[in-house]
Amino acid sequence: YLWYGGGLKKDFSKASEIQKASSINFAKLLEMCALTQPKMRIRFSTSNPQDMSLDVIKIMAKYENICNYIHLPVQSGSNSVLKAMNRQHSREEYLELVKNIFKIIPDCSISHDMISGFPNESELDHKDTLSLMENVKYSFGYMFKYSERPGTPAAKKLEDNIDEKIKSRRLSEIVALQQKHSLFRSKEFIGKTVEVLIEKESKKSSLHWAGRNQQNTTVVFPKEGYSVGDFV
């Protein structure tokens, strides 16, 4: 992606010469934000795998005010399902990207989107999704079972042919595995001191604040004179 003319554009070939000369890529734009707002915590989303470059990852690692958190939708761990979804990445490309993220930002938190029961999804396809999750061990996830959306390519071309009970069972397995991995990632913070940006009063107690750390993990702690917007 290249930024020019006040918006994000994919078709750079149609840009004017002035727009081309003054354009910057997302990595540079992110760096400019980090430099001009050093006291502001910066988090961005969503990062489509095919658009997530090494340059962006390196900029994230370079500046402390850019959060070590990447939402990286995958949808499925099966190449056949990804192809049917018309996704622009393969399982192998996705895992290579994740490998590079952890290499450059070892404590990076990664979240995902996952769909169960896409048309023609087999048990093997489902197991491929579970194995990809085991490989990455995501910190968070947004998980859904497939339902037709009128007008979408999938609704026009593919029959919604997976039984609802199967969809629900597969989704339950995905959710259970994610809960296991979320606990694993949360336990990695035990014994560590992290910086938290206070966002609001805790829902569970008026005596506590709630905020998030660099990895987008929620932290709840006693108020002790702090205020919303403080870094603690």
PLM segments and residue spans:
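Short beta-alpha junctions and helix-cap segments that line functional grooves
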Residues: 56-57, 129, 221-222
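C-terminal, non-catalytic macromolecule-binding modules
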Residues: 124, 128-168, 174
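Terminal RNA-binding accessory module
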Residues: 154-232
